[in-house]
Amino acid sequence: MNKDDDKEGLAMFSALIDGIKPITQDKRHFRTPLKTKQEIALKEQQLHANSYFSDTYQPLLPIQGPMRWLDDGVDSLELKRLRRGDYQPDLLLDLHGYRQSEAKLELAALIQACVKQQSQCCCVMHGYGSGILKQQVPMWLVQHPMVKAFHQAPKEWGGDAALLVLIDLGELPHRR
């Protein structure tokens, strides 16, 4: 190709587009992407977990001896049954390595799963020592309306690193 061909091609192109004016672009607003069902369910679950569990609430719990709590109106025999290990937990939640916000969500999900599966007893492992979760989990459990009682787990279910939790399923016959 030489310069004459370039000039000739350019002239031909100019002749072809002569009289054409650019299209005026109107602004197009695209919808924000729709949230998936999982995102919506997770957000709803977080909202419910935050409404049940407050970090500032300080219930009266035992300082010495095994960690235990019994809701008003629940027979004290239930606490004794939990202590002896008469109830076998159907679901187990291990909170080792979780942050507080994640642990709250998992705890709320565990209680919801117990209700859904008609499981009266579950085990929550929070770990040994005097860590944050060991202090917070009993305080959160006291606040949930579906929790009837909890007691430090027997050795076979984690001992002082875990709690056996009794869930209120309504008027169902007791399962052991």
UniProtKB/Swiss-Prot annotation:
GO terms for biological process: rescue of stalled ribosome. Gene3D superfamilies: 3.30.1370.110. GO terms for molecular function: RNA endonuclease activity; rRNA binding. Residues 93-168 form the Smr domain. Its EC number is 3.1.-.-. Keywords: Endonuclease, Hydrolase, Nuclease, RNA-binding, rRNA-binding. InterPro entries: Smr_dom, Smr_dom_sf, SmrB-like. Associates with collided ribosomes, but not with correctly translating polysomes. Belongs to the SmrB family. Acts as a ribosome collision sensor. Detects stalled/collided disomes (pairs of ribosomes where the leading ribosome is stalled and a second ribosome has collided with it) and endonucleolytically cleaves mRNA at the 5' boundary of the stalled ribosome. Stalled/collided disomes form a new interface (primarily via the 30S subunits) that binds SmrB. Cleaved mRNA becomes available for tmRNA ligation, leading to ribosomal subunit dissociation and rescue of stalled ribosomes. HAMAP family: SmrB. This is Ribosome rescue factor SmrB. It comes from Shewanella sp. (strain W3-18-1).
